[in-house]
Amino acid sequence: MPKLAGVIIAKTIEEAVKKIKLHEADLYELRVDYLESMENIELLLPHSNKLIVTVRKVEEGGAKRIEEQERLKLFEKFAKIKPAYFDVELYSNIVEDVINLSSKIGSKVILSYHNFSKTPSYQTLQSILDSMIELEPDIIKIVTYARDFRDNIEVIKLYENSENLIAFCMGEKGKISRIFSALYSPFTYVSIDNSVAPGQFTVGEMRKILELLGETK
């Protein structure tokens, strides 16, 4: 069955660990921008090989505004547990710093782009993808908002010429692209309790869909 990454929204590290233990997934994206306390990071060590550390900037869906240098300090703080992945935005002043940090500690890089208002044209998306490829990340993530069902096609077409790509549309009209992404991406994102992004499936919903499609272990 395709891999699923459960999105962890928590106020404390203890709460995050509890959610990881309660909900079975292949990977877990820890949204550091939602944390109110950074104490006891070491509690995540037993799960670090399944952890995606994300400090999302507010312009791309982050929970709160965090200055770029402060975001970099948070990435450096979580580098102590050597997570499987760091997720950093293409359009970020610290993108190269995070890529270098990941290289030093042996973590992989997810280079991401999010547009919460629309889906740009295929040509624009391809240009963004080309810029991301130049930075040689391990995985590229492109997420847009579907205003129309046809927006799914613009995003899905990106798979024609790219490997290690995660691309889908948010919103009710973008759900079909999430299913496509689950089938053709290294992994796809699901919620484990409350949905973080519009149109996001839960772990149970996505597993059921994949079973119906014959994608079983």
From Swiss-Prot:
Pathway the protein acts in: Metabolic intermediate biosynthesis; chorismate biosynthesis; chorismate from D-erythrose 4-phosphate and phosphoenolpyruvate: step 3/7
Residues that, per the record, bind 3-dehydroquinate: E29, L30, R31, R56, R178, Q200
What catalytic activity does the UniProt entry give for this protein? 3-dehydroquinate = 3-dehydroshikimate + H2O
Whether Amino-acid biosynthesis counts among this entry's keywords is: yes
Cite a single Pfam family from the UniProt record.
DHquinase_I
- Supply one GO BP term: chorismate biosynthetic process
Q: Which Gene3D superfamilies match?
A: Aldolase class I
Keyword Hydrolase attached: no
InterPro entries xrefs: 3-dehydroquinate_DH_AS, Aldolase_TIM, DHquinase_I, Type-I_3-dehydroquinase
Q: Catalytic residues?
A: H114 (proton donor/acceptor), K141 (schiff-base intermediate with substrate)
A molecular function (GO) held by this record is: 3-dehydroquinate dehydratase activity
Q: Which UniProt keywords apply?
A: Amino-acid biosynthesis, Aromatic amino acid biosynthesis, Lyase, Schiff base
**Oligomer and partners:** Homodimer.
Which family would the database say this protein is a member of?
Belongs to the type-I 3-dehydroquinase family.
What name does this protein carry? 3-dehydroquinate dehydratase
